[in-house]
Amino acid sequence: MTTAAQVSGLDVAPTRHARLVAWVREIAELTQPDRVEWCDGSEAEFDRLTSLLIEQGTLVRLNDEKRPNSFYAASDPGDVARVEDRTYICSEQAEDAGPTNNWLDPAEMRATLRGLFAGCMRGRTMYVVPFCMGPLGSRISALGVEITDSPYVVISMRTMTRMGTPALEQLGTDGFFVPAVHSLGAPLEPGQADVPWPCNTTKYITHFPETREIWSYGSGYGGNALLGKKCYALRIASVMARDEGWLAEHMLILKLTSPAGKVHYIAAAFPSACGKTNLAMLIPTLPGWQAETVGDDIAWMRFGEDGRLYAVNPEAGFFGVAPGTGEQTNPNAVRTLWGNAIYTNVARTDNGDVWWEGLTKQPPAHLIDWKGRDWTPESSEPAAHPNARFTVPAGQCPTIAPEWEDPRGVPISAILFGGRRATAVPLVTEAPDWRRGVFFGSIVASETTAAQAGAIGKLRRDPFAMLPFCGYNMADYFAHWLEVGQKADQTKLPRVYYVNWFRKSPEGRFLWPGFGDNSRVLAWIVGRLEGTAAGVETPLGVLPTKDALPVDGIDIAEEDLETLLTVDVEVWKQEAQLIPEHYQTFGERLPAALWTEHEALVERLNSAD
């Protein structure tokens, strides 16, 4: 067995943080790497690691004239996405993980992990990656250290976080950090050849909420391996937020400037495939309005001394789904991707560029698909994997707001919730108070099947868009949101809105144009915040009057607008009947206030007859 004394680089730690140094030594003794490297985040380090990855066959450098300083990687076909069935919240008590998370006894899990991690880095380098989630020096930010045996993870963390020496200096000699251990689970014996994408068929993505630890084994894919992202910024941070009185949320942050020059910041939570990145990079079709991006995926929010809720984007990059991203849907994302990007599981063109479905209207005549095969438009499979990804610095976005790295954060005026609903849910509804807003967040769903006329399709609930990402019992999470509202100055809380861009006609036609025209809904929301936009009370909440929604310049039929801005009482009676089944999932821990909200909705619907 390799001892710590035999591991090259272990005794040259560039820090006097005793707990960190002891932890690195402990993991090195367990995993037995050939050497240890402390990452500084420098360009020289990035160049060295990308050269190493090219040599190993993991990366291909793209055409520098087309995509400067950009790289392509193809994963193992069995390692292409987050593995929710292998993701665990190992709280001390099972009930603290709740019914929506996988739980195993933490002592049992630790024993399993110790067995898997024993010797798992043999023949490899162990990289120590200090990183900061959020702007360096912000009171809203927090630090972490990831140990990994994947240089692909190191270069990706350099894009996605503030990584290296600045984060290590911020940590000082005794600062708090979240320890995150990652291994591909692919040790190399002496003389054994490596593969381009090492991984293991056994996978565990494990969180220990009480000790704020993350252990990930067997996967090299982003969400499972870049442990600052979902693992820390949502699962562990949501527990920290519960304990410390703040919010860690799966939300974009958007800066909106009205024609009068007034600025509002909006946070929005949508499940996957509901247009979050598109809204974060919105190009308004309304004349005089400007939209800028603060964040596209995660928001950390704390109350400021003035009583307002301030948000930072804890990430430094975008880790986006490539397919469906194009000039028609998200031109700002396309312009962000001019260079300094890592593409995973997209297709490659004959001239050393990348392509994916949705990038252009017509595909190239020939490609190399994500599995390395020749591809033509006649091929039966997509050229890019549906979950193909790009990793790119956020600062390259042409609409990035100057405030995106402000350590003070930005004050949030409104919070939006929404799913992909073909039926029932109006275009936009204002909650009269915070509690109704929490109720809206708790019932977010997307329709997974088409509905018959006058009925509702099968719903997949994703409350607050946090179902895969909440690090503790979701009923307690709802209670935390309610408590945050109760403790705050009610006059300074953000207003809450329930939006739905995806309403369809009975024939399956979208009623709302969406994309840049969603700025029209945001304009009404800003009007509500400023007291200038008219609304009408409904059993659900306040909807725009037809005259209050600015629809000049878009082709929308009068009856479609009527449908979008109406609460159909009979359909909502059906909708209300579906909520108890969802709530009963959470048992007795569900806050009574949400049952009260549900009962009040039923009463308002019955009174509306």
Swiss-Prot record:
Q: Which domain of life is it from?
A: Bacteria
Q: Which SUPFAM superfamilies match?
A: PEP carboxykinase N-terminal domain, PEP carboxykinase-like
GO CC list: cytosol
Active-site residues are C274
E.C. no: 4.1.1.32
Q: One GO molecular function term?
A: GTP binding
Functional description taken from the UniProt entry: Catalyzes the conversion of oxaloacetate (OAA) to phosphoenolpyruvate (PEP), the rate-limiting step in the metabolic pathway that produces glucose from lactate and other precursors derived from the citric acid cycle.
- This protein's name: Phosphoenolpyruvate carboxykinase [GTP]
Question: Where is the organism placed in the taxonomic lineage, from the top?
Answer: Bacteria, Bacillati, Actinomycetota, Actinomycetes, Frankiales
